[in-house]
């Protein structure tokens, strides 16, 4: 199946200092990303909270950033604050779009080890990016991409949810550190590169085991929305990041407390949410 994915927007980054600048701002090794390859990356606050996660594509003469459409303007506004004398230009590409391509029999594919870069190829000016979960992004002019198909978009979202690939949007920015979103597993964080905003917090969380929340797939009886609270009784226990429809309700990718993994979960309205899958390990009770 193929469909345009209106969730995503595209930014072109050009100028002689583009790789150096992004290397110092993002969580992955952009400086050593080869032409014709792509990677996942996060842009974080100084406190390590994820402002946006993205795919970075090196086209040789420039870089493309694929992120949530509703984050494009706020992220560019923040990045431009730090350009100063660097030779780098950010340009949102309004005539570009992103499509998803997925085999009809594709199975959910969870990350086993970080994939810090993956192949991309130019096919008649449409860049095809082979994502680690077996789906493909197609990035190019809107008229060159497959049309929008709601059922196919939902199938794409289900595949990413069940594979553990979260996407931050305006409703969920600054709610989680990278590890809570599985970025250390899928390859969105390079732990041996230099400093970037939030690097100290993210590294400390990784090596001192300070992360107390992680991704989970939750089944609900109705359609949820990004940013909806997950609760245990009256207490906050997490937040829904992404959602997709099923025949009997929804599947939702949420960040939840480790301690809530075996509890009775609900959304903010009291609707039951059932844990289908955890992307973290719960220590057995003694």
Model-derived features: where do they sit?
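Residue-level signal for inorganic ion chemistry
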Residues: 15, 65, 198, 234
